[in-house]
């Protein structure tokens, strides 16, 4: 579809509401105003007007706002009609506007896409709009606002600027090899490169925090039947999310709870007890449990402390450990400490974390919460932080890899040309974050995930 068309969409959520907003962007916005309002509102002033149908009858009445480009969200002429939030009224008004020549419905995210294409936002800021709408906690919302205001982009621009200066220095060393000073071996370039690498690592650390705030951690509770898995889910959720009985195999399907630990989203998944099952329904539940386990960020291996004194996972259940992915982090949770009399606490056993607690009484649950937060490297202090997506982390990782390779070329071979190429590739990776270097396919995927009216 053409980006020069005039587009229209509902900017408020579908359904009934006190206010419903239609947004128009493009060259024909002023023509829409004359047709529907009978006049062009004064720019950036709220005008209370009737919204007219083609025969002159009134469809609705409300506030009209006109923002001439380039001083608008999209950088184009923008008209907003704020009327009553009934779906029938909004649909009639939308049909009225679409009947005008040159108007079409906006694609998902097209308003934000036009803001990006018209240099009103960079790509990271545009993504922050969607992240702000989807924020599931106060910290995530504040970090999304920081990203929208350019906090993340500013850090990326600082890195790109530092790489630009470094590339100039390296290119000069390559272009003037006959100078008395050997710029590649005098330590200045290496010092600057080390500084950029350190700054990049700091941004990566902050980005990982931002990614945790946005996406959270998927934690699967797994173990044998009647180990207390559902009781642990209820204790973490702070409510009776799962049915708890003394009957083994009560949980037969996957149960999901979304909670927060000091602002970090946590996706807790309770699964069916793992055993050889003859019942078809239970067997399907166990297969689903294994699917969730294999996709988890961490597994809480639930153990009934009254049935074994073992603390090493392989000794507790070797068949379970043999089936787990080798890189999957595990925390052994010895449950029913209120019965066994074990001392509550967190210890390390052969590289695995082990927590003793009572899911029934809630003793030790706070220790588990702190452990989950610390195991992901999450810190509650996100003042000035920003949200980050997986593509941002991948771009930062790629840039770091190119800088490491460039450093090796510098110190081992004084290979200026190869260093310059690695610096260029690192700069290109960073520019993908803000959209200064992005494929059309990438832009399409990003903006298609937005709301229609954004």
Swiss-Prot record:
Q: Does the keyword Cell division apply?
A: no
The UniProt annotation places (6S)-5-formyl-5,6,7,8-tetrahydrofolate binding at: 23, 80, 120, 454
Q: Name one GO biological process term.
A: tRNA wobble uridine modification
Residues reported in the UniProt entry to bind GTP: 226-231, 245-251, 270-273, 335-338, 358-360
Say yes or no: keyword Chloroplast present: no
Compartments in which it is found: Cytoplasm
Per the record, what is one GO cellular component? cytosol
The record describes how the cofactor is bound as: Binds 1 potassium ion per subunit.
**EC number(s) of the enzyme?**
3.6.-.-
The cross-references to CDD domains, in alphabetical order and at most eight, read: trmE, TrmE_N
User: Which protein family is it in?
Assistant: Belongs to the TRAFAC class TrmE-Era-EngA-EngB-Septin-like GTPase superfamily. TrmE GTPase family.
Q: How does it assemble?
A: Homodimer. Heterotetramer of two MnmE and two MnmG subunits.
As for what it does, the entry says: Exhibits a very high intrinsic GTPase hydrolysis rate. Involved in the addition of a carboxymethylaminomethyl (cmnm) group at the wobble position (U34) of certain tRNAs, forming tRNA-cmnm(5)s(2)U34.
Protein's name according to its UniProt entry: tRNA modification GTPase MnmE
Q: Which organism is it from?
A: Yersinia pestis (strain Pestoides F)
